[in-house]
């Protein structure tokens, strides 16, 4: 009988899946733990819930004790990290210690490592490399096509299974796809999957959205969950069903209700970004885009060019950070800058009009502001940003934003970029009607 890992019970004696990330560099925050996030999403796609994630440093005794604890409360443990040849790679040894078993050399694995590394005879007896070849006698090996550290699938006791993977994301992912998915589906899945569809919002906060969809947030299947990010909001709709089509049918009416309520604010779904949506719309209209940036210092350009295909619409950007460059590159008179100030609606508008002309683009966006932490005044505090958008038929849109002084410099820059892209998106949307 397969263990049921698909329930949502919160009872303390309820068993399930756990993820254990091993490595002092993760514990100290020197490296971001992307593996756990990725595995969590994979488990959801397989229809499994996991109830706990743990991170532990490179200490054999602590790892061993924690694995003993996990074996008492979970059916399946997935570990990442600690499988390499260095002294602080302790995972396999610690697991063996947890269950008081002996590790045995797999000679075929050593042959694989020698072949991969083309080892000279003087290095072939290197014990640190060879430690990667030792496993419990009855463990199933998960081969590593991209590295030297194999993982394993092992059942140390009835009702408990361990899957181990190296910490290198590219190695872990290919091993997972080639071995783990099939094993988990055969041994732990009850035929249900979780399928999610995410709606991406801009220009509206989480609290305002939540107020209007209180009834949807209480749904059990599908569930609706908000995830706020800097300047954006995601609503993830997740259904549990026997197949993807059934899940999509459960999600469909909820998605339609949300789109009806928030049509102006929803810019895309799933992995779509403001940049990708904007580029798609400009391509459809056969129109081009250029920027004149001051306080964002090129971040707006960097954001748009991260999207494949941006070269078909994006002409370029004039980074006029100093007043001198505003004069020489954008032809803004010195006396005009002195009169209104470099951070002003008037200068932002001059920047966008002149950038559009110089870059020969259909649309242009200019931005000038005070990102802080210094440089603000009572009249123009830190966080003030002026955005101006110019387009065909003498179109001009001017926007003034004052972001909270509690925001740091990078946050103000990122929020400013978000407003720029979303504002042009809304302008194009209004012209499409």
Curated annotation (Swiss-Prot):
CDD domains: cinA. It holds the Pfam family CinA_KH. InterPro entries: CinA, CinA-like_C, CinA_C, CinA_KH, Competence-induced_CinA, MoaB/Mog-like_dom_sf, MoaB/Mog_dom. Belongs to the CinA family. NCBIfam families: cinA_nterm, molyb_syn, PncC_domain, PRK00549.1. HAMAP family: CinA_B. This is CinA-like protein.
């Amino acid at each position: 009988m397969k263990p049921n890992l698909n329930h949502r019970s919160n009872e303390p004696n309820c068993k399930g899946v756990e993820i254990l990330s091993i490595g002092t560099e993760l514990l100290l925050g020197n490296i971001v733990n992307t593996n756990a996030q990725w595995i969590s999403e994979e488990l959801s796609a397989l229809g499994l819930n996991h109830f706990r994630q743990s991170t532990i440093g490179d200490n054999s005794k602590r790892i061993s004790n924690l694995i003993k604890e996990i074996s008492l409360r979970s059916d399946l443990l997935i570990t990442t990290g600690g499988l390499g040849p260095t002294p602080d790679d302790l995972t396999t040894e610690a697991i063996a210690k947890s269950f008081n078993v002996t590790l045995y050399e797999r000679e075929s694995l050593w042959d694989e490592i020698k072949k991969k590394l083309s080892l000279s005879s003087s290095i072939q007896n290197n014990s640190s490399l060879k430690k990667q070849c030792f496993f419990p006698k009855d463990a199933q090996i998960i081969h590593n096509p991209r590295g030297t550290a194999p993982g394993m699938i092992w059942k140390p006791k009835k009702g408990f299974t361990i899957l181990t993977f190296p910490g290198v994301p590219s190695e872990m992912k290919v091993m997972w796809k080639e071995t783990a998915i099939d094993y988990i589906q055969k041994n732990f899945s009850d035929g249900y999957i979780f399928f999610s569809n995410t709606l991406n919002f801009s220009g509206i906060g989480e609290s305002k959205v939540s107020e209007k969809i209180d009834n949807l947030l209480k749904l059990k299947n599908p569930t609706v969950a908000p995830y706020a990010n800097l300047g954006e909001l995601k609503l993830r709709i997740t259904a549990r069903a026997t197949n993807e089509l059934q899940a999509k049918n459960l999600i469909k009416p909820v998605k339609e209700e949300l789109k009806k309520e928030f049509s102006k604010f929803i810019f895309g779904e799933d992995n779509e970004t403001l940049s990708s949506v904007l580029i798609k719309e400009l391509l459809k209209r056969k129109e081009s885009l250029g920027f004149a940036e001051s306080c964002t210092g090129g971040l707006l350009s960097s954001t748009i060019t991260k999207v494949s295909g941006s070269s078909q619409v994006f002409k370029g950007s004039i980074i006029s950070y100093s007043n001198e460059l505003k004069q020489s590159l954008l032809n803004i008179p010195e006396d005009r800058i002195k009169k209104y100030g470099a951070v002003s609606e008037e200068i932002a508008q001059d920047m966008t009009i002149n950038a559009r002309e110089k870059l020969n683009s259909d649309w242009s966006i200019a931005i000038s502001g005070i990102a802080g932490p210094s440089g603000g005044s009572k009249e123009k505090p830190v966080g003030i940003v002026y955005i101006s958008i110019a387009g065909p038929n003498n179109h001009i849109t001017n926007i003034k934003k004052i972001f909270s002084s509690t925001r740091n410099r990078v946050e103000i820059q990122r929020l400013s970029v978000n407003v720029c892209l979303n504002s042009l998106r809304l302008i194009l949307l209004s012209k499409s009607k």
